[in-house]
A protein has these predicted regions:
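Active-site lid/adjacent beta-loop-alpha segment flanking the redox-cofactor pocket in flavoenzymes
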Residues: 293-399
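Beta1/beta-strand and adjacent pyrophosphate-binding region of the FAD-binding site
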Residues: 41-58, 77
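A conserved short coil-to-beta-strand element within the FAD-binding core of flavoproteins
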Residues: 181-190, 225-244
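Rossmann-like flavin
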Residues: 107-219
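Short hydrophobic core segments
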Residues: 50-53, 79, 233, 246, ...
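Glycine-rich FAD pyrophosphate-binding loop
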Residues: 67-91
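Central helical "cap/lid" subdomain
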Residues: 248-299
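C-terminal lid/capping helical subdomain adjacent to the catalytic/cofactor pocket in oxidative enzymes
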Residues: 2-48, 65, 69, 240, ...
Length: 471
């Protein structure tokens, strides 16, 4: 479609932290439908009971759950700066992989064992809920319930990983029964990774996120939701009647409540989150063998850490190709290329060649496969100062809610998080009445922690040694 009047993402007067208007092509979106650029009406509605900013996983999931209760009749409008699912979810690695033990010990150290376990249990429940809705509604999105392998090729890192595993087992968390940890000479044969010293496996999922969200979009439009793509919100202001004035380059509209679901771009409209949720770029690619050849079989999804501790995540595709990304340690020294950077129109220069011959040098049996990169892209994620998403009522802004800051880990969180946020929006319940992990709650304390703290003490760039004790 031809995008009319003033819908480029960055126009005069728009906030800095806005998506660029020309994102690079991405494998997942090659067969995009017209829904990606849908507008339900030529003009913006004058008023909606609820306006959702962002048509990615968070925004569409929230809208889905808001419409599930047939007894509640609320008008809903979704405003999206670009196309549907054009951000992080539409450009990710295809994983829906709960965190069983990776960051959980950090959360335990900061807030106690139960607080850490809540997150793992929530993410496992999220995976099951996604599986259930996909099966019930017969959604064509290549969903596969699989085993995911964690692999360590560095001896020191392998020992630390085993110690973490033993610690988690000692806590008697029931979900750890699903984890199998391997050490010894048989590890390379078990995981298929050259030089592997230790590996672990547990239940996870892989999927085509863009197709999943296109299904949700069709459902929402059928339910009467008003979707406006290429309509960046430039400001949200309360009026004297208790409503909100939503400004866009296409005009203004009013809303009863506002849900901020723009993830990395949240601070464009909520500047208090400017040091809490930082846009950070990542890199991802699709690798395939020559047409007509058969790729070596890989049944599991992976996170692999090489001998120099470079982490990569990947999922095997039904067509034999691989989607792989990561390599953060390669581009991390070049801060300007990825940190506080919203430009997903260009690759991360320092890492764009990292995945050449990746399968041949990493996985046994791929040496003569001829596998090459067929597509490579970048995306912008919202990383938070303390590694937890911000969910709930925006402090000191009644009627505004946030669901953002997923740290590149939104797939295992968003579906059920959006369900609980929808309850807060519709039923008026407090965060403490939801099923959300306590550490996910946005708060003035967390906002102040990042605003008043040092960048180098936060989790994104630094040591994570900030104070976590409330005064």
């Amino acid at each position: 479609m031809a995008i009319p009047d003033g819908t480029a993402s960055r126009t005069a007067g728009t906030p800095k932290c806005m998506p660029v208007s020309n994102p690079a092509d991405c494998f997942w979106q090659e067969d995009a439908t017209e829904l990606r650029e849908h507008r339900s009406s030529e003009q913006l509605p004058e008023y909606s009971d609820i306006v959702i900013v962002g048509a990615g996983f968070a925004g569409l999931s929230t809208a889905h759950h808001l419409t599930r209760d047939a007894s509640i009749s609320k008008s809903i409008c979704i405003l999206e700066a670009r196309g549907v699912c054009s951000g992080a979810t539409g450009r990710n690695g295809g994983h829906c992989r709960p965190d069983f033990y990776g960051h959980i010990p950090t959360y335990m150290d900061r807030a106690g064992a139960r607080a850490g376990a809540e997150i793992a249990e929530f993410e496992i429940a999220n995976l099951r809920a996604i599986k259930k809705v996909i099966e019930q509604e017969k959604i064509d999105c290549d969903f596969t319930l699989t085993r995911s392998m964690d692999v360590w090729c560095n001896e020191e890192s392998a020992k630390k990983a085993e110690a973490v595993y033993q610690r988690m087992v000692s806590e008697n968390f029931e979900y750890m029964d699903d984890v199998v940890f391997y050490t010894g000479d048989k590890v390379p044969g078990i995981c298929g990774v050259k030089g592997a010293i230790a590996c672990a496996s547990f239940t996870a999922g892989t999927m085509w996120p863009f197709k999943f969200l296109m299904h949700l979009t069709r459902q929402l439009l059928a339910a009467g939701i008003n979707l406006q793509t290429y309509t960046p919100v430039t400001s949200v202001a309360a009026d004297s009647a208790g409503d909100f004035i939503i400004a866009t380059p296409r005009g203004k509209m009013r809303a009863g409540k506002v849900v901020h679901a723009s993830n990395a771009y949240a601070s464009a409209l909520l500047p208090e989150y400017g040091k809490n949720i930082i846009p950070c770029k990542g890199i991802c690619c699709r690798i395939a063998v020559p047409e007509g050849d058969t790729a070596p079989l890989l049944n599991n999804s992976y996170i692999t850490r090489t001998q120099d501790n470079t982490l990569s995540y990947f999922v095997p595709r039904p067509d034999g190709s691989i989607v792989v990304g990561g390599a953060a340690s390669v581009f991390r020294p070049f801060k300007d290329q990825w940190y506080d950077n919203v430009d997903d129109s260009v690759l991360i220069d320092s890492a764009k060649d990292y995945y050449e011959d990746y399968m041949q040098r990493t996985y046994s049996g791929w040496e003569k496969s001829g596998a090459k990169i067929s597509n490579i892209w970048t995306g912008v994620m919202g990383y938070s100062y303390d590694s937890n998403p911000h969910i709930g009522k925006v402090p000191s802004k009644d009627g505004q809610f946030i669901l953002a800051g997923f740290n590149g880990h939104g797939m295992p969180v968003i579906w059920l998080a959006a369900k609980e946020l929808a309850r807060m929006v519709i039923q008026g319940i407090q965060f403490e009445e939801t099923k959300l992990p306590r550490l996910f709650q946005t708060s003035q304390f967390r906002i102040d922690l990042a605003q008043n703290g040092k960048e180098e003490d936060g989790d994104i760039l630094g040591t994570g040694k900030f104070s976590t004790t409330k005064p």
